[in-house]
Amino acid sequence: MSLLQFSGLFVVWLLCTLFIATLTWFEFRRVRFNFNVFFSLLFLLTFFFGFPLTSVLVFRFDVGVAPPEILLQALLSAGCFYAVYYVTYKTRLRKRVADVPRRPLFTMNRVETNLTWVILMGIALVSVGIFFMHNGFLLFRLNSYSQIFSSEVSGVALKRFFYFFIPAMLVVYFLRQDSKAWLFFLVSTVAFGLLTYMIVGGTRANIIIAFAIFLFIGIIRGWISLWMLAAAGVLGIVGMFWLALKRYGMNVSGDEAFYTFLYLTRDTFSPWENLALLLQNYDNIDFQGLAPIVRDFYVFIPSWLWPGRPSMVLNSANYFTREVLNNHSGLAISPTLIGSLVVMGGALFIPLGAIVVGLIIKWFDWLYELGNREPNRYKAAILHSFCFGAIFNMIVLAREGLDSFVSRVVFFIVVFGACLMIAKLLYWLFESAGLIHKRTKSSLRTQVEG
């Protein structure tokens, strides 16, 4: 890449970054937090944060990258995607009408809410316990990270349930919403994330997500400033780099350490070059339509129920890795959100996907606002826990693609909804057995006076 070509790419990158950052800043000033702000920051991180890192790798370490025209296509496609997304998100689908009292779809009380978070936590802890009994601490047993996807590891499906520890702790926080509950959320979820990091053999997702949710809650409540957020972000990047070194068993120093930091940080937070690599192989793609979305549900079907289930699920990531790049290393290369749309339908699917994503984020913000307006604090805690718990799925959306997001968010909704139903059933059984006594104002007054 020549200096002139880099200058042209830099101008495009700068304009796109300023465009998205400016809109995000105005939205932040207006509401302080919503899921549009979160997704916008996530989009910036995924598609634009990596450009400076790539530039240093190219000019400092002479690393090969896709041709400049392909990199330009990647930057422009990301900028255009966000423009369509933003217009869709801001478009009002119906006229605003005065709030009319409606019969709520469901309601929650104190016992049901506490039962819900206990069940969610139980699912996570039991899954971790069973996985540990089968495999032990994989971080200290396996020689390479790719081995966690091999037949040596049993009970892989259980990993999908680990994440429900975070929504459980979110319910605990939203029931109190004070600084002690906020710090308890951080300590408990990060400790659980470190435990799963050692047991699974290097998966950092639970740690990243717990830390991100902690920071956003702090921003919402005014407990941390933007400067503190930036400092925490730098600390998070360094922490993720250290965990990556441990995961891959690397011992580096000097220039090699700087080089390793650049490419691991880029691959962890901003896999934008994967999109460029996919666009470089555009002519080799046999568009898959909506099949990757359907195929991604295969992983949730146990083999005993479907003996002929394919051993390799050909979602957009696996199709890109195996069929387009002919890479059979065992690790799937993340195609990113835009890349998954290209795999499904080419360039035409990019604006269509942007419209779909705009509606998805709009729906999450509607739920979030519903929780903000909800007078029943127990129901509000459940709604907020569901919304913030879905942050993991939004990260999957940006990094892995629309197909992976759809299957995971449906799984999340089903499990979360099942926990709610079980909690309500248990409450009904306990109440029928006379084990639950409703609090009265007189008893509460007596407790206060005592």
Swiss-Prot record:
It is found in: Cell inner membrane. It comes from the Bacteria. One of its GO terms (biological process) is enterobacterial common antigen biosynthetic process. InterPro entries: WzyE. It is a multi-pass membrane protein. It holds the Pfam family WzyE. Pathway: Bacterial outer membrane biogenesis; enterobacterial common antigen biosynthesis. Keywords: Cell inner membrane, Cell membrane, Membrane, Transmembrane, Transmembrane helix. Belongs to the WzyE family. Probably involved in the polymerization of enterobacterial common antigen (ECA) trisaccharide repeat units. This is Probable ECA polymerase. It comes from Shigella boydii serotype 18 (strain CDC 3083-94 / BS512). The gene is wzyE.
